[in-house]
A protein has these predicted regions:
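Shared catalytic-loop signature of beta/alpha-barrel
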Residues: 1-87, 91-94
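Extended hydrophobic packing segments that form well-structured cores
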Residues: 96-124
Length: 124
Protein backbone atom coordinates (compact mmCIF):
# COMPACT_ATOMS: atom_id res chain seq x y z
CA UNK A 1 0.00 0.00 0.00
CA UNK A 2 2.87 2.39 0.79
CA UNK A 3 4.95 1.34 -2.25
CA UNK A 4 7.95 0.62 -0.04
CA UNK A 5 9.43 -1.68 -2.71
CA UNK A 6 9.88 -1.25 -6.44
CA UNK A 7 11.16 -4.79 -7.05
CA UNK A 8 10.46 -8.04 -5.19
CA UNK A 9 13.05 -10.81 -5.07
CA UNK A 10 11.28 -13.83 -3.57
CA UNK A 11 12.94 -17.23 -3.45
CA UNK A 12 10.82 -20.06 -4.86
CA UNK A 13 11.97 -22.51 -2.17
CA UNK A 14 11.24 -20.14 0.71
CA UNK A 15 8.04 -18.73 -0.81
CA UNK A 16 6.34 -22.13 -0.90
CA UNK A 17 6.85 -23.21 -4.50
CA UNK A 18 5.57 -22.28 -7.93
CA UNK A 19 1.95 -21.59 -6.95
CA UNK A 20 2.85 -19.35 -4.01
CA UNK A 21 5.43 -17.42 -6.03
CA UNK A 22 2.81 -16.91 -8.75
CA UNK A 23 0.43 -15.49 -6.09
CA UNK A 24 3.15 -13.13 -4.81
CA UNK A 25 3.78 -11.99 -8.38
CA UNK A 26 0.06 -11.33 -8.93
CA UNK A 27 -0.14 -9.16 -5.81
CA UNK A 28 3.04 -7.34 -6.87
CA UNK A 29 1.64 -6.80 -10.37
CA UNK A 30 -1.49 -5.18 -8.93
CA UNK A 31 0.80 -2.68 -7.17
CA UNK A 32 3.01 -2.09 -10.25
CA UNK A 33 5.96 -3.85 -8.61
CA UNK A 34 8.32 -5.91 -10.75
CA UNK A 35 9.68 -9.36 -9.95
CA UNK A 36 13.34 -10.42 -9.94
CA UNK A 37 13.23 -13.90 -8.36
CA UNK A 38 16.10 -14.92 -6.10
CA UNK A 39 17.96 -18.00 -7.29
CA UNK A 40 18.15 -20.77 -4.73
CA UNK A 41 21.41 -22.07 -6.24
CA UNK A 42 19.66 -25.32 -7.03
CA UNK A 43 19.18 -26.47 -10.60
CA UNK A 44 15.64 -27.64 -9.82
CA UNK A 45 14.76 -24.29 -8.24
CA UNK A 46 16.40 -22.43 -11.11
CA UNK A 47 14.41 -24.35 -13.72
CA UNK A 48 11.18 -23.83 -11.77
CA UNK A 49 11.80 -20.09 -11.60
CA UNK A 50 12.80 -19.84 -15.27
CA UNK A 51 9.60 -21.60 -16.31
CA UNK A 52 7.52 -19.37 -14.02
CA UNK A 53 9.27 -16.19 -15.18
CA UNK A 54 7.95 -16.73 -18.69
CA UNK A 55 4.39 -16.44 -17.38
CA UNK A 56 4.85 -13.27 -15.31
CA UNK A 57 3.77 -9.97 -16.82
CA UNK A 58 5.84 -8.10 -14.23
CA UNK A 59 9.00 -10.21 -14.62
CA UNK A 60 12.15 -8.08 -14.80
CA UNK A 61 15.22 -10.29 -14.40
CA UNK A 62 16.16 -13.72 -13.04
CA UNK A 63 19.12 -14.18 -10.73
CA UNK A 64 21.17 -17.06 -12.20
CA UNK A 65 24.57 -18.04 -10.78
CA UNK A 66 26.36 -19.45 -13.81
CA UNK A 67 29.54 -19.84 -11.74
CA UNK A 68 27.77 -22.33 -9.44
CA UNK A 69 26.35 -24.39 -12.27
CA UNK A 70 29.40 -26.30 -13.38
CA UNK A 71 29.88 -29.61 -15.19
CA UNK A 72 28.32 -31.92 -12.61
CA UNK A 73 24.94 -30.17 -12.82
CA UNK A 74 24.87 -30.86 -16.54
CA UNK A 75 25.86 -34.52 -16.15
CA UNK A 76 23.45 -35.57 -13.38
CA UNK A 77 20.52 -33.56 -14.77
CA UNK A 78 19.56 -33.90 -18.41
CA UNK A 79 17.83 -30.78 -19.69
CA UNK A 80 19.36 -28.22 -17.30
CA UNK A 81 19.67 -25.01 -19.28
CA UNK A 82 22.96 -23.16 -19.66
CA UNK A 83 23.25 -19.41 -19.54
CA UNK A 84 24.74 -17.91 -22.69
CA UNK A 85 25.39 -14.20 -23.19
CA UNK A 86 23.11 -13.36 -20.27
CA UNK A 87 20.16 -15.43 -21.49
CA UNK A 88 18.78 -18.92 -20.97
CA UNK A 89 16.53 -20.90 -23.28
CA UNK A 90 13.30 -22.39 -22.03
CA UNK A 91 12.90 -26.12 -22.32
CA UNK A 92 9.94 -27.50 -24.22
CA UNK A 93 10.19 -30.80 -22.31
CA UNK A 94 7.37 -31.71 -19.89
CA UNK A 95 7.36 -30.33 -16.36
CA UNK A 96 10.46 -28.38 -15.44
CA UNK A 97 12.35 -29.92 -18.35
CA UNK A 98 14.72 -31.89 -16.11
CA UNK A 99 15.42 -35.59 -15.98
CA UNK A 100 17.74 -37.32 -13.51
CA UNK A 101 20.62 -39.18 -15.14
CA UNK A 102 20.59 -42.19 -12.81
CA UNK A 103 23.67 -43.80 -14.39
CA UNK A 104 25.73 -40.71 -13.65
CA UNK A 105 24.32 -40.36 -10.13
CA UNK A 106 25.21 -44.00 -9.37
CA UNK A 107 28.88 -43.14 -9.99
CA UNK A 108 28.78 -40.85 -6.94
CA UNK A 109 27.65 -42.75 -3.82
CA UNK A 110 26.50 -40.72 -0.81
CA UNK A 111 29.14 -39.48 1.59
CA UNK A 112 29.37 -41.17 4.95
CA UNK A 113 27.98 -39.22 7.87
CA UNK A 114 30.53 -36.57 8.79
CA UNK A 115 28.84 -35.04 11.81
CA UNK A 116 28.44 -36.34 15.32
CA UNK A 117 25.08 -36.29 17.08
CA UNK A 118 25.90 -32.81 18.39
CA UNK A 119 26.56 -31.49 14.90
CA UNK A 120 30.36 -31.39 15.14
CA UNK A 121 32.13 -32.18 11.87
CA UNK A 122 34.43 -35.18 12.20
CA UNK A 123 36.61 -37.43 10.11
CA UNK A 124 37.47 -35.07 7.28
Amino acid sequence: EKHAADVLQPDIANAGGITELKKIAAIAESKHITMAPHNVCSPVGAMAEIQLDESLINFEIQEYHAEFYTGHYFTVLDGFTRQKDGYVDLSDAPGLGLELNEREIAKHPPLKKITSSGGTVRGI
